[in-house]
UniProtKB/Swiss-Prot annotation:
It comes from Stenotrophomonas maltophilia (strain R551-3). PANTHER family: INNER MEMBRANE PROTEIN YHJD, UPF0761 MEMBRANE PROTEIN YIHY. Keywords: Cell inner membrane, Cell membrane, Membrane, Transmembrane, Transmembrane helix. The chain crosses the membrane at residues 48-68, 101-121, 144-164, 181-201, 216-236, 251-271. InterPro entries: UPF0761_bac, Virul_fac_BrkB. It is found in: Cell inner membrane. This is UPF0761 membrane protein Smal_0716. NCBIfam families: PRK04214.1, yihY_not_rbn. It is a multi-pass membrane protein. It comes from the Bacteria. The keyword Lipid biosynthesis does not apply. GO terms for cellular component: plasma membrane. Belongs to the UPF0761 family.
Amino acid sequence: MEPLDTLNLWMERARDRARAISFGRFLWHRFLDDRLFQAAAALAYTTVFALVPLAIVVFGVLSAFPVFDRWSDQLSDYVFSNFVPNAARAAEGYLRQFSASAGQLTAAGFIALVVSLLITLNSVEETFNQIWRVGSTRPKLTRFLVYWTVLTLGAMLAAASLAVSARVFAMPLFGTQEGRWLADLALRLAPILIEFVCITLMFRVVPHHTVKWRHAVPGAILAAVILELVKWGIGAYLGSFQSYQKLYGTVAFVPILLLWIYLCWVAVLLGASLSSSMAAFRYQPVELRLPQGYEFYGLLRLLGRFHHARAKGKGLADDEILRLEPMLTDSLLQDLACNLQEIGLLRRDERGEWLLARDLEQVSLSDLYECTQLRIPVAEQHLPYRDDTLGRVALAALDDLRLPLRERLKRKVSDIYTDSGDTP
């Protein structure tokens, strides 16, 4: 879909009042379910312990390449000048000092630092998977390669960007008055653009889930805006309240840095929750929604889709499943797929599509009931798409389960104890 078409689609949906209200409620419930503030606190705690190993890895990678080594100081200065509150600037000196002392570490100490960094990165991935309702994770080796690639290439790309920008701003064009104005504007906008690009790529790469650009971009915009507001708010507060320096003295930067890291994670996770909500939200009229308690009907229809896809020798992507079965929500689809993956019935291929991993002749309804823990509904409800082929066979299978159960449930509770006697 073209960017202009996507924007027009968003505007059209925003004018649909019922859809907008429904999405607002859905988004609020997702915010509450994700427990973002608690997750941000946990990530802030682990991030503090990962700052030193992160600095060691980044500066170590840059020092390994002479062409990048001389840009490490400029990179550090740029990061702390544009992304960290001035009151926490003292942390830069400590991190550089710790990085310079990395050569004195023993092998066990270095391994401990790397492990703490990997734990932090793993915590970030787990939090993002939780936000996107992904139950499965990448294989350990794949995760390690992704983390290492992001750290090493990220450091080199950042240093290379500084080098290129320095060469560009040294051109005669930027020596004129108009050129200086343009350079000043670019320098002001660069931190915001960097935040936006980094967060967008984070939303695309980190979750073990296919995140589309049209969902990642709005979340990244929200996160970048919140980050700028937080940066301005902390600066305004610290500028009018100086008592913290008298209270904490030379370590005054520590609580400020902790607060800044926490608020950064709050902004990023709020943006991630918006992105996942946009991908998961499916607006349907009431008559086309799957009634609560009839998820087993949706499960049988879902397996029917996989049965037909397997006969054609192909898999099904999440978007295609939701298009074929619009009654399913993204959250329900992810829950069902993860449950079926646990019993080896589904698996993902290298393209992220779901495939049947076992023949359905080897699976009983009892297996489905035990792995999903879905209820067998008793009351009559209007079910969407009950008259198509999948609807008829799924409803017939469900009736075979629930109609005898309905008769059994008509039994009086007192009948259970009729023959038990008067005493326990």
